[in-house]
Amino acid sequence: MKLHYVAVLTLAILMFLTWLPESLSCNKALCASDVSKCLIQELCQCRPGEGNCSCCKECMLCLGALWDECCDCVGMCNPRNYSDTPPTSKSTVEELHEPIPSLFRALTEGDTQLNWNIVSFPVAEELSHHENLVSFLETVNQPHHQNVSVPSNNVHAPYSSDKEHMCTVVYFDDCMSIHQCKISCESMGASKYRWFHNACCECIGPECIDYGSKTVKCMNCMF
């Protein structure tokens, strides 16, 4: 009976998220999994807008770092108009502390039949772009998000203007969670990763000075 109840509730949650209008809804790609978990555990059932905030603290703890992005999915805060700031215009970035440059280069040389897209462009082009995405740096020692500012003397890839360096990045074809994105990029030896809030994952190679490309290019995860 309990399994049946959980299945019905999960289906109802997914239908609810699908029904929400695109321009006025929560970030489905980012929030669906965690929202479902919190609702199944009945931690977000109260309605602050109606004066009942008895579950607010438990719901916030359940959503954790996703509270700011996902509180509107569970009716805890006012809905936002995402037509002005689509998920593709935001991303989370992180440096990977044990990159394997030789592995990354080997996996990205030549044509591959794997489910990813390899893109290379001059480092000078990478550095010339202004950071027009809202990016956050997540590290083990810095649990709170902070705006990214990357020094030009990044230890992963020293840059010299007298030689043309190429920045190589890999986009996975399919959408994935931020956790899976980090694991996938670590497994191919990347130096950093960028996870767009539409769930597109970009692994960044050792020659890149900044955080790769700010453009979504995941074949099956563009919106």
From Swiss-Prot:
Primary localization class, coarse: secreted
UniProt-annotated location(s): Secreted
Keyword Secreted: yes
GO molecular function: heparin binding; transforming growth factor beta binding
UniProt xrefs under InterPro entries: Tsg
Keywords per UniProt: Developmental protein, Glycoprotein, Secreted, Signal
Signal peptide segment: 1-25
GO biological process: one example: mesoderm formation
Annotated PANTHER family: TWISTED GASTRULATION PROTEIN HOMOLOG 1 (PTHR12312:SF17), TWISTED GASTRULATION PROTEIN HOMOLOG 1-A-RELATED (PTHR12312)
Comment text on domains: The N-terminal domain is sufficient to interact with BMP4.
Assigned protein family: Belongs to the twisted gastrulation protein family.
Name listed for the protein in its UniProt record: Twisted gastrulation protein homolog 1
